[in-house]
A protein has these predicted regions:
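Membrane-helix boundary elements
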Residues: 20-61
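Alpha-helical transmembrane segments and their membrane-interface exit regions
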Residues: 43-44, 125-136
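Residues within membrane-spanning alpha-helices of integral membrane proteins
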Residues: 11-18, 67, 97-100, 104, ...
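Alpha-helical transmembrane segments of helical membrane proteins, especially in multi-pass transport
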Residues: 62-80
Length: 140
């Protein structure tokens, strides 16, 4: 079983997993640096067929918003690990696990209702990487 120290370390893994996508999406706001995000979204909306594109200003704007939210969420999780976890480890675990589950449900439902169901399957892997051993309370 996982210990509090394991959970605290895993919070940093969670922050890095969440935060990775933020700069990628923010870079997609500029035509010269949008290919990684475009390819990533193409893979998430399987099959790889050139959809979606970053041709519209709306897509670039939504990438800016999403990138910012993801970086902010990642910084929050990192700071929960470094500033709060020692004082309230179970509360931090709950906050991150429930937050990740809320993201999973809303993002997956939105993906399915918009016809992009493959993303809901990818979301399972992301959820498992974010939550990791924090599904259960620490044993110490």
């Amino acid at each position: 079983m996982a210990t509090r120290a394991t959970h605290k370390r895993w919070l940093k893994v969670s922050a890095l997993v969440i935060g990775f996508f933020g700069p990628v999406l923010t870079l997609a706001t500029m035509p010269a640096t949008d290919e990684l995000a475009r390819l990533g979204l193409d893979i998430l909306t399987w099959p790889v067929d050139g959809f979606p594109t970053y041709a519209s200003d709306e897509m670039r704007f939504l990438s800016a918003l999403t990138g910012g939210f993801l970086v902010g969420w990642a910084v929050t999780v990192w700071l929960l690990s470094t500033l709060v976890h020692d004082a309230a480890p179970e509360a931090v675990r709950h906050a991150v696990v429930y937050g990740a589950c809320a993201w999973f449900v809303v993002d997956s439902v939105g993906s399915i209702t918009s016809g992009q169901w493959p993303n809901a399957i990818w979301n399972i892997g992301v959820l498992l990487m974010v939550v990791g051993p924090m599904w259960r309370p620490a044993e110490d």
